[in-house]
Amino acid sequence: MNKILFSLGMLLLTVAAYADGTILFSTAKGSIDVPPYRIPGITCGHGGRLVASAARLVCGTDPGFGRVDCVVKLSYDNGRTWSEHEIDVACGDTSLINAHKTPMEAAYGDPAVVMDRERNEVLIMAVAGCTVYGKPSTNRQNPNLIAAIRSTDGGRTWQKPVDQTEDIYGLFDKGNVVDAAFVGSGKLFQSRVVKVGDYYRIYAALTARPNGNRVIYSDDFGRSWHALGGAAALPVPGGDEPKCEELPDGRVIITSRASGCRLLNIYTYSNTKSGEGCWDKPEKATMDGLALAPSTNPTNGEMLIVPAMRNSDGKPMYVALQSVPTGTGRNNVSIFYKELASPDDMRNAKVFASGWDGCYQVSSTVSMYSSMDLQADDRIAFFYEETLTKWGTKPNPVSTSFPQGEGEHNYDGCELVYKSFDLETITDGKYCVNRRINRGKFLKANYEDIVDSFVLTAAQKRKVKDVIKRLPAEPTSAQMDAILKGEVR
């Protein structure tokens, strides 16, 4: 009888978590002397594993104003239960802050997290030190620092942070120089298609000035990095906090924070292994014609593209999801969706930015940053900020950003809430997740239409289309490169 009651209790707990959400990190339960939380990120591993990351704002706000720590909580059952206590990833040290040089160990904030799809290895990229991104004193000689923090046991323990500041800033020194940058927080993106060496490729989108976003990638799970498109590439010159995702054909899409829209651009490889290729032109996705619209007070959001089936006719396709607050303020976080069923849905950035099909409202109150990923049980893990608790203000530290320690900063944060949804709920029953999709078959019609637009002889087009017909269920990067270049030999 006790076993039956225990099982029933666990079932009720599971239903409650799915219906109402689970607060993983709480600010409202604290005080002016208890660190608030912000900046959610979530990544899904194999076997139902989830890692939820957050910034513990010991100073009360962003890195640059004092100590900030990176922390995580873990789930091994697709979010039904979570570790009771938060796990320290990297903790800042206030005593190191000074007015002469910013030490990396002062703070670790704005975490961006990814778990390898084949291992229990987890990577967090964090902005480090004590410089304020927008301050003129934060420059190439005194930059925002960038730390890489690694776990090899699924997030239970973490290695010492590694300073990658010069490794990343240096990628752009011979092109469009970066004065200040940090990796867009939330979820780092790992390719489902591109694998060079031992790991699937990972991508990180940078908030950077001047000239907006850059994208970097790594083939060794963040031990070394390369600039996507080269040192001079400017994929979204007006972009703020960005994220990356991958189209079914292996192209990379960047989505960036902006007022009343998302700024999008697409990178097409000419040689996936070497990273060569080019960016399209940035476009605005305003989600015109829907009941809700992206907020005019922009925040960081997430894009996720999932394999799906259209329920009305059983057609296999993909569905793009984009989370962002809606309305006039930082509130009403929602998920917009768009079906990717034909070449016209994703041929270029302009086409991708238009024709969104609907929107699902997650929150009906103050809500801001969000992150999402596809769980092993085919539900969408959604981790976001809800409600804002303001406890007051604190004085700024004596640092390179505030040499005299002048001024004050807010001491506030949010409830970081985990929910999970099936795709039917988000899309009003129109689609369900379909991992059995034959990607090669899905891409064939798309590729044939693309090849028809190429300037090739009839014989050359026939040769390329013959290769397209023979595509396997999981085409290689080299096969896709050759088709998109029209250079099949």
For the regions a language model picked out, list residue spans one by one:
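Charge-rich (acidic/polar
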Residues: 440-455, 461-489
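Hydrophobic h-region of N-terminal signal peptides that target proteins for export
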Residues: 10-18
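Anion-recognition interface
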Residues: 7
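Short stretches within intrinsically disordered, low-complexity N-terminal or propeptide regions
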Residues: 18-19, 447
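Asp-box/BNR beta-propeller blade signature and adjacent active/binding-site loops
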Residues: 20-442
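Positively charged n-region of N-terminal signal peptides that target proteins for export
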Residues: 1-4
